[in-house]
Amino acid sequence: KPRFYWAACAVLLTACSPEPAAEKTVSAASQATSATTLTVPTARGDAVVPKNPERVAVYDWAALDTLTELGVDVGATTAPVRVDYLQPAFDKAATVGTLFEPDYEALHRYNPQLVITGGPGAEAYEQLAKNTTTIDLTVDNGNIRTSGEKQMETLARIFGKEARAAELKAQIDALFAQTREAAKGKGRGLVLSVTGNKVSAFGTQSLWAS
């Protein structure tokens, strides 16, 4: 009887014993990872990115514009272009190449936690992704409004700016509504783009049609 009693106690103690330290460590590490990263949709599928990274490099002017409006400071981006509303962002950021040719040495010195690319800049995605976490947030020009909103939502999630993104979306929706109202009964319209001495017209299948 004593042998049976002590054997039964041993079984009960084994069953009730806490999980091994190694398992606890793995579990804690998994929880820490999930607390500091998140999964977001990109033009190349879902990607795991750091939450609210402090050092960000951007090779996409649309994303740079959106981040600026969200109130996110971008530490590194391309050489400046002549876009007035982006000048403050260019002035504050380190230059890490151009939209088409990243300066990998400068980027390495900056040591970003996240690289954001898109559009023409996404051609360098594969090389950029070899060195650090990189996401491609190219906007679909065939559905620019919806795609642009998704890009903004993704960036807002990464940087914890959901409230500001909701404000911006409301402003955009209001502008669309005002434009539709102003165009009522005015017949057909034509969208022109003037770049230097070049004038371009955009039709119903262009990026502006959406």
Language-model features, listed with the residues they occupy:
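Bacterial Sec-exported substrate-binding components of ABC uptake systems
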Residues: 3-7, 15-59, 163-192
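N-terminal hydrophobic signal/anchor transmembrane helix of membrane proteins
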Residues: 52-72, 145, 150-152, 169, ...
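A short, structured surface patch at a secondary-structure boundary
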Residues: 55, 60-109
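Short, acidic/turn-prone active-site loops that include or flank metal/cofactor-
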Residues: 79-83, 121-122, 138-143
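Alpha-helical, coiled-coil/dimerization segments enriched in small aliphatic residues
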Residues: 81-86, 202-210
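Proline-aspartate-enriched helix->loop->beta-strand connector
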Residues: 111-117
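Extracytoplasmic substrate-binding proteins
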Residues: 131-197
